[in-house]
Amino acid sequence: MKQERSSGGYSGIPPTSKCLVCEHPDGGSAHFGSTSCLACAAFFRRTVSLNIQFQCKKDKNCVIFHELRMICRACRFDKCVKAGMRRECVQKRRSNKKIPKKHMNMLREDQIKMEYDECKFECSGDQTDDNSPLSIEKKSPPGLLPNDSPMMADFKFDPSDIPSTSGGSTQRLERSPSPKLAESKILSMNGEELLRFYVDQLKNSMDRRRMIFTDTALLAVIDDRGDVPFDATEPPPHSLKRQYESQRFDNLLAFDFCKCCPGFDFLSRVEKAIFFRSCSLAYCLLDIAWITVQAYPEEAAEPVLMYTDGSVCTVNNLSYGWDDEEDICAHDKKKLFLGFLGRFNDAICRPIRNLKMTHVEFAALKALCIWKLGYCEFTPSMKVIGKEHEEALLNGLHNYYDDLYGNPDETGMRIGNLILLMGTVFEMNQLIMETYKSAELFELFKLDALSKSLLTL
């Protein structure tokens, strides 16, 4: 096994064969400024990079020993710190490997074609891989299987859905995947790195919103906070005029995300536009749910929604955030949005709140929705790239849950709930698209030029 190289370089630690954390007798080596085994080093790196917060269920003085089957993760992390491991030695996510443009088209065509052939080979018959991170059915408890949701039928990859191009593809050879072919990957990062990328993107978007929409912009610069920036004590009332500006900023956030998203460089111009629309919907719709739940951890008797600019409106009545505006009256706003907002609060915000979803889980849910909810519009090459994102994200989630819970049943239940929630998000996406198309058709309120373009895709 290749030994992990310490991120902090040579630290002057005398060589020893004993891990200072779990006391393993022959696994000690230099890691993050201390001496530990590879398992404890990986645990520390994952905990720091994903910013996981553990809580001890006892007296914060649990025994940490390598022969114990169950080890308190909170006390294990504390012991890592006491042993001398330093957070600053954990490297941030490496940037995605850049490929010279002169090789981009050739690499894109060959790798995506090979991945598609491999996927076609794997989908034939009823073969399943027990080790695959997509084998959620084997890990989820009864009642939480993805197939139980009618919406999830739209997310299955069936190669027969891809139209035949016999006139232009007769020279493409059908071949079974070789071991070399099976290792072909478009992404240059593993599941944990990809999950960390999406978590970083979520934090960056919140810091940018703090810069634009709050009076505490400097905190985003000096603290690198990444939390929801809005104050729920005296929020401003929502208006469509404010929404016009916040939607433009959400589109800018989606643009920044697309430009650095792994695999985006492989897409054609039309594919990039389709993918951007999925990102724009996620940065608007899903972020509203996350911001609302973080601002209001407990649902009030009169629930409200907080938008991506920090403004709020009531959900069950017109008491706040439903005033008449220059372009539209409160009655028309009620007909357009009140029913949708009530459904959105019940179907999206409430489950996120009840699940006590962490920022890592929400980042994974958002990423899965981006790559899966537009699946019926995706080209074969987009489906291949999306498949790799999905596999890597689920793999990263498994590792995250293993560290957080250490319980396979809890892991299966959490992942099953995330997958089931995707079907509801798909429904909300369709409803809001229909609402905006109606508004554009009848000129009910002002839409920015980019949003109008996305509606015509």
Curated annotation (Swiss-Prot):
Gene3D superfamilies: Erythroid Transcription Factor GATA-1, subunit A, Retinoid X Receptor. Keywords: DNA-binding, Metal-binding, Nucleus, Receptor, Transcription, Transcription regulation, Zinc, Zinc-finger. Signal peptide: none annotated. Its main location: nucleus. Coiled coil: none annotated. A zinc finger (NR C4-type) spans 19-40, 56-80. SUPFAM superfamilies: Glucocorticoid receptor-like (DNA-binding domain), Nuclear receptor ligand-binding domain. Residues 201-457 form the NR LBD domain. It is found in: Nucleus. Residues 125-182 are annotated as: Disordered. It comes from the Eukaryota. GO terms for molecular function: DNA-binding transcription factor activity; RNA polymerase II cis-regulatory region sequence-specific DNA binding; zinc ion binding. PROSITE patterns: NR_LBD, NUCLEAR_REC_DBD_1, NUCLEAR_REC_DBD_2. GO terms for cellular component: nucleus. Residues 16-92 bind DNA. Residues 162-171 have a biased composition (Polar residues). Orphan nuclear receptor. Belongs to the nuclear hormone receptor family. This is Nuclear hormone receptor family member nhr-20. It comes from Caenorhabditis elegans.
